Amino acid sequence: MILPHDVPSQHGSVSAFAERLVADNSPRLYLLEDESRRDARDLVFQVGYRNEAERITALVGPCNLGQAVDASTDHALLVLLGEYAQHLGLIERLQAVPIDQRRGDYPPQSKLIEFLVGILAGLEHLEDLNQAPNPLVKDQAVITSWGQAGFAHYSGVSRTLSAAGDDTLSEVIEVLGTVSQPLIDAEVMALARQGRALVLDTDLTGRKVSSTSTTYPGSGFGYMDGEIAKGFQAAITSLTGGPCGRLLLSSQRYSGPAQSAECLRAAVQKMEQVLGLHPHRRTEQVQQRLQTLAANQDRLQASLDAEYARQRDLFDALQAARREKALRQAEVEQWTAESQARGWVERPHSKLAQARQRVVRAQKRQARAGRELRATAARLTRWEHTLAEGQVQQTQLLDWLAQLESENATLLHPLTCVLRVDAGFSTDDNLTWLIEMGYVVYTKAHNGQTTAKLCRQLPATVTWHRVGRNAEAVYLPHQRIAECPYDLEALLVRYHVPTGYLYTTLLYYGDRPPPPWLKDWFSGYNARQTIEAGIKEGKGVFRLRHPWVRSPIGMELQEQFSLFAANFVRWAAQWAKQLVRHANRALNDALTEVKTLVQDVAHCRARLVHNALGRALIFDEQSPYAGSTLCLSGQVAFQHVLPFFKSLNFLPPETS
């Protein structure tokens, strides 16, 4: 067991303790034989008492403790994560992933696990597995905690990632999803118990590569991080507001030219698949669209029928004009022949001249009927095409309605789902789709012309309300935005900038009115910066800024492992709080900060004490977390390492 220091104790200097050594034979002072610290300059001693062992025996009873192991690690967090991975069954599942590669010194699945451990360690490059100051491949405590016989050279890991195929990727995604699902469900359940909505975010981020590289298959030029660059795009979704703060739900990779709008639907569908739930579909809205479309189709069909009748009339008029023209032409020929036979001179009002005028009028009537007939034919073609499109749309809407009704039929406990997306996603079609999918939508206007139009419609006496440090807003209800068939609530925002004003428009759709306080609306939308923070964390903490390998499957594995790592560290931190037997303030703070855990605690020295009673992780006395202890399993008896010639706490012999 771990003996806490919460019983009565005395505090004194080493000199005072030395006097007790002379007066009392109970305490013992001995050197710590720690082979892993042979280069340490400080002389380290352990202090204890003879009766301490007696007290342990009395507490645990007679038992065989077996072979005790007192090891050290330079990667304390990774030992904890390895224990947690075994607790979740992650390692066992990853070891069953198929990889088409011959086994060398280590199985390919072991290298896949090593790859994940490197990501969890926040290594900058794959070669840091071997070349970092304290290389992971030499840390036996980490290797053991992850259930491996050893870690391979980084070049072997790279070859394994190159050998991985689509079946490897799909199986890894399934394993990570299976392990994550109960924990995601717990996050959702915690929100549901509180009656809170699920707040979801979607964003597109770039994965840059060298602009001159030709060895990244599928990469291309696109807009990334405010500039045109070469690489890939990743559509990320997240859930916020639960006990873990933020969980990343899915990541889908696209080529560099991909744009936000075309990635939205796949991202939302994948997000729903991961969550295992969705909001109540708004089938009544689809039914209303169908009714409106049917009425439009009926009106169009009536117009078509009338136009067909007009076409027939015009055709008859054209035929009549042709017959009249032929008749009048015959009259002209007759009068011409008679005039020539009698030697008449053609006068302006003669019979011949009048006959010629009747021919001209007949020609004009024929030409007019022909023009109207051609215009009618073009109009009929256009309306027939519109009618056909409407029929196709009706069929699609009927199928869409049937799908939504089917999804509603299997939905037992619908939750309110709020989805926040930026302007790049909010095209007319995407807004319509999200509304009918049942989401409460917070977004920005996709087209700047929308904001310009709303500004032109503002009355001169409008009152602006402050919503931010340099932002003011005005509420504009029930706005039709471009081709979206539904009314949206608009918040026209203007920012004070040195050159004047900068305008933008926030949009909202939900079953309830938007937040009554415009500042809450403004802040609620801008809180989507949490997913931007998650993207930044992925690039800066889990090193997605640079691809570790060039193979397409390897890059996709890095993407999926990094997304999982962001969640895994959060879950492990929650788990670790239950294992703490003693923690200073620094460790308590670190357990709430992923960046600190990965960049500091993951590279912090600690002792791993292990015997038949259990395992404990004790942070090094030189670390910021000195003396902090995590009981990984069971109960472990151990002694703290204390520096020589320093003050110390000790238990007097009579204390029990």
List PLM regions with ranges:
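Anion-binding and metal-coordination hotspots
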Residues: 2-72, 91-656
